[in-house]
Each structure stands twice: as C-alpha cells, then as structure tokens.
Amino acid sequence: MNIKIVCVGKLKEKYFKDAIAEYQKRLSRFAKVTIVQVPDEKAPEKFSEAEDEKVKEIEGQRILSKIKDKEYVYVTAIKGKQRSSEEFAKEIQDLGTYGHSDITFVIGGSLGTSDAVNKRADDLISFGKLTMPHQLMRVVLIEQIYRAFMINSGSPYHK
C-alpha cells in the first residue's frame, strides 16, 4: 500500500519531525509513506473573507497538483466524519481489499482547505472538534494511520 500525506507549510519543530520520522519508520513494514509539503500562502494578519478564500484557493491548487486521479483521498476537516480507531482501521483494510492501494491524506493550512480540494476528496475525516495546529495534526494523523495498521495486524499496540 502507498500512503501519501499532503500538507500545507513546512514543518520546523524538531520534536514534530522526530515523531513523524519515528512513525514513518514503524509504518515502513506495512506501507510506503510519503510526506509532501506544499508552500503555504502568506496572508496578512487581518484580512477579508474574500482574501481568506483566495489564500485557500492558491493553497488548494498546490495541493491538487500533488494528487493523482487513481488515489483515494481523505481530507482532514472539522466538519468531516469522526470515527473510532477501529472504524478507521477497517476502512483502511477495506480500501486495500477493494483495490485502493494508493491512499492520500490532505492536511490544509491554518485557514483550512478550498472547496475544490474538498470536492476532490473521497472522504472528509475529522479527528474531533478541537482546534489544533496543522503541524501537530501531522503527528496525530500519522500515529492514527500506524494504529490502524497495528489494529489490522492484531498487535496489542492499541490496547
């Protein structure tokens, strides 16, 4: 299975980089995991809703340029569907069973994702109603992907 995580912005904090590298290493026995960073668009401190949409649109074009037609795409979104770790693990397993060997996860920038990115999504996924930095979301997401593979392999990691 090939898993790609497309994220807006560059990860700067070493502790986040270290955590992600650790989970990538752990996942390597189950899947090839690629992380693709696209540049974030600079926005003024105070901006209008139209400027907000323009930033999301520009970032959205950058995201969409990294997604292939055959990929099954999850977009992280507050309004997405929440599921348990077990439900998520079953979805990942089912995708592989039914021929989706390329799965892409999208984490938008601080303003979220554009309508075009959300329309391209096969599924909108939420990790709760809490707001968190998108850099931290990368760690949460990759850990949950790892947890899904561990659940599917029958490992006691999830207990």
From Swiss-Prot:
EC category: transferase
Catalysis performed (reactions): pseudouridine(1915) in 23S rRNA + S-adenosyl-L-methionine = N(3)-methylpseudouridine(1915) in 23S rRNA + S-adenosyl-L-homocysteine + H(+)
The keyword Isomerase appears for this protein: no
Protein location: Cytoplasm
Molecular-function annotations in GO: rRNA (pseudouridine-N3-)-methyltransferase activity
EC number(s) reported in the record: 2.1.1.177
InterPro entries: Alpha/beta_knot_MTases, RlmH-like, tRNA_m1G_MTases_N
Top-level lineage group: Bacteria
Principal place of residence: cytoplasm
Coiled-coil ranges from the UniProt annotation: none
Record bears the keyword Metal-binding: no
SUPFAM superfamilies named in the record: alpha/beta knot (SSF75217)
Amino-acid positions noted as binding S-adenosyl-L-methionine in the UniProt annotation, renumbered to this chain: 108, 127-132
Entry's Gene Ontology cellular component terms: cytoplasm
Keywords from the UniProt entry: Cytoplasm, Methyltransferase, rRNA processing, S-adenosyl-L-methionine, Transferase
Sequence similarity: Belongs to the RNA methyltransferase RlmH family.
Subunit structure: Homodimer.
HAMAP family: 23SrRNA_methyltr_H
Family matches, as PANTHER family: METHYLTRANSFERASE (PTHR33603), RIBOSOMAL RNA LARGE SUBUNIT METHYLTRANSFERASE H (PTHR33603:SF1)
Its biological purpose: Specifically methylates the pseudouridine at position 1915 (m3Psi1915) in 23S rRNA.
Protein name: Ribosomal RNA large subunit methyltransferase H
Species per Swiss-Prot/TrEMBL record: Lactobacillus acidophilus (strain ATCC 700396 / NCK56 / N2 / NCFM)
